[in-house]
Curated annotation (Swiss-Prot):
Similarity comment: Belongs to the CcmE/CycJ family.
Periplasmic topological domain residue ranges: 29-148
Reported function: Heme chaperone required for the biogenesis of c-type cytochromes. Transiently binds heme delivered by CcmC and transfers the heme to apo-cytochromes in a process facilitated by CcmF and CcmH.
Disordered: annotated segments: 128-148
Protein's name in the database: Cytochrome c-type biogenesis protein CcmE
Entry-linked NCBIfam families: PRK13254.1-1 (NF009727), PRK13254.1-3 (NF009729), PRK13254.1-5 (NF009731)
Taxonomic source organism: Pseudomonas aeruginosa
Subcellular location: Cell inner membrane
Amino acid sequence: MKPRNRRIALIVAGLSALGIATALVLNAFQSNLVFFFTPSQVSAGEAPLERTFRVGGMVERGSLKRQRGELAVQFVITDTVKAIPVTYSGILPDLFSEGKGVVVQGRLDSAGLFRAEEVLAKHDENYMPPEAQHALDEVQKKPASRKP
């Protein structure tokens, strides 16, 4: 093989390898990409069916239903305009409660029910873990001792 043909073959092989590597990386990004939607966007049909995405909003008051003795839970997420029903099987975060912010990740089925695989409770910037709050409360209850 002539040096020129060998050089062309190496360039073609290198470009092919680069193209394949780029395609694999883009495919990995595409499969791990999780979009965020509001309940209004989900109700309007903007969210994909049978594909993982996130929905954020408030847990509607009075919508939380638990099965006795099971981890299954149903609730409704709203953005004050539209609401979507959610079902989840697992342990809910400690901060999860009605009227509070939540982000759920999962899939929307053809019946319009969001089947959550993960539930994340949102909190405000003033949140403090209960242990830390208790420690601060105890310190504030003790009389301040002054040094001379």
